Regions:
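Metal-dependent phosphohydrolase cores
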Residues: 1-143
Length: 143
């Protein structure tokens, strides 16, 4: 998980995360914070283990901690957050030592995390479900 630790310590990641928290401080619905990222990571990891898939833990956690970081650009520039997040993720993942093949898996998953059309056992499909399961929408006070 050494490479994953490099992500959360990466200067661009920290700056983008702080900007995102500021932009969402008055958000009515639940935000995109460390609690959400950690929930998505944990749920994804459990689902991967249950299906006996060979996806390393740091790939899962890295994807979870990067998947909504494009929200800052969405709010400021009107760019879809999955596309903005994929661009940001590519830069950060490269700096943190992930291979081109690993980056492709993670970036593709980030691009598909809102609308997946993958086979059920793919990482993108698992990640999509984990992202949805991470939210307690049924008890949402904003509804």
């Amino acid at each position: 998980m050494e490479r994953f630790q490099k992500i959360v310590c990466h200067e661009t990641y920290k700056q983008t995360y702080e900007k995102l928290q500021e932009l969402e401080k008055d958000r009515e619905f639940c935000g995109h914070d460390m609690e959400h990222f950690l929930s998505v990571a944990r749920i994804s990891y459990l689902m991967v283990l249950e299906k006996n898939l060979d996806i390393p833990k740091d790939i899962i956690y890295a994807t979870a901690f990067l998947h909504d970081m494009g929200r800052a650009d969405q709010y400021e520039k009107g760019i879809s957050h999955d596309e903005a997040g994929a661009i940001l993720a590519e830069e950060i993942l490269k700096d943190c030592g992930y291979t081109a093949a690993e980056r492709k898996i993670m970036v593709d998953t980030i691009l598909k995390h809102r609308d997946v059309e993958e086979k059920e056992d793919s990482f993108a499909a698992i990640f999509y479900r984990a992202d949805k399961l991470s939210r307690d929408c049924i008890h949402c006070k904003a509804r």
